[in-house]
Amino acid sequence: MSADAVFCELGARTNFSFLEGAAPAEEMVVFAKKAGLAGLGIADRNSVAGVVRAHAKAKVEGYPFQPGARLVFADGTPDILAYPKNRRGWGHLCRLLSAGNLRSKKGDCTLHLADLLEWQEELLLIVMQGEGRPEPESLEVLLGTLKEHAGNRLYLGLAPHYDGFDRHDFAVLAAIARKAGIGLLATNDALYHDPHYRPLADVVTSIREHVPIAGAGFLLQKNAERHLKGPREMARLFSDYPEAIANTRKFFRELAFSLDELSHQYPDENADGETPAESLRRLVAEGAAERYPEGVPEKVMRQIDYELELIHDKKYEPYFLTVHKLVKFARSVNILCQGRGSAANSSVCFCLGITDVDPQKFTLLFDRFLSKDRDEPPDIDVDFEHERREEVIQYIYRTYGKEHAGLTAAVISYRSRSAGREVAKAFGLSEDVQSALVSSIWGWGTSPFTEEQAKGAGLDAADPLTRRVLAYASLLMNFPRHLSQHVGGFVITRDRLDEVVPIMNTAMPDRYMIEWDKDDLDELKILKVDVLALGMLTCLAKGFKLLEAHYGEPITLAEIYQDHRDAVYDMICRADTVGVFQIESRAQMSMLPRLQPREMYDLVIEVAIVRPGPIQGNMVHPYLKRREAQRRGEAVVYPSPELKAVLERTLGVPLFQEQAMQIAITAAGFSPSEADRLRRAMATFKRTGTIHTFERKMVEGMVANDYEREFAERCFNQIKGFGEYGFPESHAASFASLVYASAWLKTYYPDIFCAALLNAQPMGFYAPAQLVRDAREHGVRMLPVDINHSDWDALLEGEGAFDKNAVHPRHASMREVIKTRKAVRLGFRLVKGLKQTDMKALVARRGEGYRSVHDLWLRSGLSRSVLERLADADAFRSIGLDRRAALWAVKALDEQSAVERLPLFEGAGSDDLQIEPKVALPDMPAGEQVIHDYRTLTLSLKAHPVSFMREDFSRRGILRSRDLAATATGRWVTVAGLVLVRQRPGSANGVIFMTIEDETGIANIIVWEKTFQKYRRQVMGSRLVKVRGRLQNQSGVIHVVADHLEDITPMLGLLRREARRFGVNDRADGALRPSADAREKKKLRQLRLGLPARAAPEGEAAAQVAEVMPKGRNFH
């Protein structure tokens, strides 16, 4: 470092000063080192959310860094930069920020000067000048107050505004500092590192202030000077105040705190005077006796002893005991839960009941979970029923308190869509152009914007404004927008959590989160436990309850795992897996008939193989070929007996991360810790490229062990192909058991499976409409929502013989297997806009049933608007009212009248208080009924929208999806349907799987990358699409490989064509509202006589119908 490098920047902000700072923390560190600064302090607005990233980068760069915070006050106090001198000072800063967070709504921090005075000990403080001219009197009072508390830990900051008044302002501030007896300290108050980032700073200011850049005026920075400046430039700017420069180095040297000092202390979980080690060993022994009732195998005992010894050396016993406590609580209140991820490699976790995968059955690798040579905490993920996980979360808060337990943060960052829209708005582009720009973007990626996307949005790619929008949208991507709560990562500490990291409120009541995300915690080696939510566990829990209540068959997950049936695997092999956990996507379905799973380990492979890692590593086709060869009786040849032991279970093809590690250990002489570093390098390969550092060691190590160099290089390239997508076998094994359990339930009880899936929404790949269609194809009778029969959840009704003829022909083999005897009654939860509390009141007061709309209104206590939603959902059929008649009756209720709420009139005679004359209402046409069903329920039991277009489609040569099975492979076909799902598996050569639906079922479309680029708008924007392509039939799985796509969404207007003569508008009752108005009477006469009334124009009608049809779900 040069001799003049004596300036430390202490006023820097990063993009974690949300929409103020305009550069990432890591780039600030790198630039500061390059600029020759003696040190860098980062002080973001009321937050330390970005300091761990800077800390990690500074360690890599070997550069001095200190964490702090810029305190912004709500009481008019000028901003103050606060830096901790030591560990105690850090705890005080965290307590200070926590106090401001907890008195505010999520995302805000309300600080007062009194908070700082309470927590200022061991903090160094720099009082900053505001944007205006200095106010000597108030500033002198503030400095006097602060000096009484902070003494010589207080400085007055000098930051140039570059507005022509700096010399004057500095003189005023210097005089105030001399009078107060405190030092001056120089800072450039940097918002970004490089002056070229000034335009991006203007963009984030525009977004923050909700005004376009052209109209932002003085809200924008006056110049591009707010960047990190080198020591020479700063010395020149402060040549009149050299002490202000010198004080930055003095200040920095007084800071003796490092984030590495934050040691994690897990709460002691002692029981009856036992040490944590004694408690853990006892619980493991008890669990092992239950897991192995015929005696614990010697191999298992050795593994348990090895794991317990390592856990003891690392002092992790309290962590395992805490996770065990959470699982024990969940099971005590009948919440289904199951551990997964790398923890499934552990026999200790298996014996504690945390996981349900016996590592001895799957040749798993404990070092993948915990290693004596690896200084990083273990990571245990536990899935709970997603509707009941909150009970576990509140148990944590009750047990440990918010001062000791908090959810991990998730950093919500700008992605392609949000960045494109916000930057386009900042540059003044219209909403239509904004929507066009982002509508063609797939998913929520972070790929830079291209000229092709601009052209697709109708923009001139050569226009300078367009180029700026694309450039700054690309720069803004990955910038943090705000902090949200992680899906379930919890930090639990023995000492106060708010002295380790600030805590804050979340958007949900009675929840608290910290400011750091999981990567920050990993960097600081702070332990967390993931309390995750899994919809399939909710589905299975509800399904098991229905099975016991209606069929008298109590069952558990463990019992299903032992009940291996051919019928279940037969259904899986046919890819009849809509709704089945993990294998319901089109990509998975296309694999199932080729893989032909016949046992649990086959499902482990199925879960893992349709992943980007095996695809990138060119492992899928070799594995399938070897499996087919095995079925023909051909033997697999292995390069050595040692590798056979590693790869035999996957027929010589490495599919899992654990196998990559075992190959490195067995064939290349890696130690377990080196193999784990290889695994970590695989996980970060795309971002860091560090996997190449292992290539020489692995290849040469294998050659030294007598493997051919070509084979060694091929092995390494396969492992490298995993990239960041390599799938752990332990994770796949945990999920495979749920695959089988859900498939078992669907095989034998499709009525229960459908009801449980509907009652666990939102979850899974398909919307309720497709789950209902699939259940009907399996012979399940579906009943509509009804005020006298429905509950919030879907119910099972009736009793009778199963109608085998109701099963769709393609599921004919299931007719002798299915045990269903019930119908499924749809629940109120499907009706848009209804609240569970309202529907509970309706059910509780229903008695023997409601006799009329008026009776429902009187007895339920529900508002007229709730009854309107029920009428819109056609839920009054049991009292003889169709949708239109029910809406008429609801509109007759006087919402403003209170007379019927008086106790005197709540008797039987109150129905006569308001009597409306009966009106001859025309029946609502079938197309209009379907429109309203989709608008209120997102599905219809009456008809499919495409059925109204079939006559037109047939004339155009458009086949039904049902016809594809009888069509020869290779033939050109045309199909059309509603777009249900678009799936783009990562790195699968850009292919998109589309699922479309007509009145006879679904058709599966393959869109290759070249075709997608040509028809991007049609793929991404169509609600109703026509596809021409070649039919492909592989092992009974049918696809249409698209060659041409057409957006035919406007044809949805056909659903309204038959309704026009009735003058029906968007609301079914809108043209029929009872009124004394003469114009209304004239309309009514027209309706009775069948006279034409004004209808919406063709395009408008189609747009209205399209709006209520499903958009299609996008998945990666």
Curated annotation (Swiss-Prot):
It catalyses: DNA(n) + a 2'-deoxyribonucleoside 5'-triphosphate = DNA(n+1) + diphosphate. It comes from the Bacteria. Its EC number is 2.7.7.7. CDD domains: DnaE_OBF (cd04485), PHP_PolIIIA_DnaE2 (cd07434). The keyword Cytoplasm applies. GO terms for cellular component: cytoplasm. One of its GO terms (molecular function) is DNA-directed DNA polymerase activity. It holds the Pfam family DNA_pol3_alpha. SUPFAM superfamilies: PHP domain-like. It is found in: Cytoplasm. Its main location: cytoplasm. The keyword Cell division does not apply. InterPro entries: DNA_pol3_alpha_NTPase_dom, DNA_pol3_finger, DnaE2, DnaE2/DnaE/PolC, DNAPol_HHH, NA-bd_OB_tRNA, PHP_dom, Pol/His_phosphatase_N. GO terms for biological process: DNA repair; DNA replication; SOS response. Keywords: Cytoplasm, DNA damage, DNA repair, DNA replication, DNA-directed DNA polymerase, Nucleotidyltransferase, Transferase. Belongs to the DNA polymerase type-C family. DnaE2 subfamily. DNA polymerase involved in damage-induced mutagenesis and translesion synthesis (TLS). It is not the major replicative DNA polymerase. This is Error-prone DNA polymerase 1. The lineage of its organism: Bacteria, Pseudomonadati, Pseudomonadota, Alphaproteobacteria, Hyphomicrobiales.
